[in-house]
Amino acid sequence: MLSLHQEMLLLAVNDDGDIEFTAGTSTFRLAFVGACLIELALKDKIEVDPEEVRVISRDVDNDATLNLVMKRLCEHSTPQRLGFWLSHLQADVQEITRLTLMSLCDQGILKSEESRFLWVLSSRKYPVIDGTEQKEAKLRIMETLLGDSIPSTEDSVLIGLARAGGLLEAFLSKKEIVRLEDRLEQVSNLELTAGLVELAIQEEQEAIARAMLVSSHPF
């Protein structure tokens, strides 16, 4: 199984290897960092509640991206609020992205070619890992949104993060997103930690908007 942050990044890579424009936005960067934090929570490395993020295991992971995030978390001797980490880790987003892209290349899903990251397989399925074949994230999201089944925890979280990070616009029109709004509400972030992350992302977005407004209209 691929991790949440790997699948988040794959949602931003289109069929010709270019990166979707939405990946350059602050909303995507917040959601991408949020995916790393949720993945750590699912691996029982951290605990997230409305007040703070606590490290509960410092064991080294086999994922270089998560190890970098854990290193940053452990640099603070006292627990910090979720919003703090979403903002603080923005300084590492470029390196977090690079490490995640490299991990996808190492797994034979992407290949680097002239500043682009091309899909190795055209079947929209990931290479077989541990004997299991997994459909690509966009296909799973579309099947969930257009169907009536309850998604897995991972897919529910991924849909919520894609929504918060503006990635749905990469493969759905605005009209389709509006039409699917009720279904999105039904299937997004059924997992508690993911719901807290999405709320914190919204709060950070509002803070960024307020700061931009104040800076453009100084008193």
Positions of PLM-derived features:
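Amphipathic, coiled-coil-like alpha-helical scaffolding segments used for oligomerization/assembly
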Residues: 103-109
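Short aromatic/hydrophobic-glycine micro-motifs
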Residues: 45, 109-110
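Short, Lys/Arg-rich nucleic-acid/phosphate-binding segment
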Residues: 51-53, 114-119
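A structural motif
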Residues: 111-112, 133
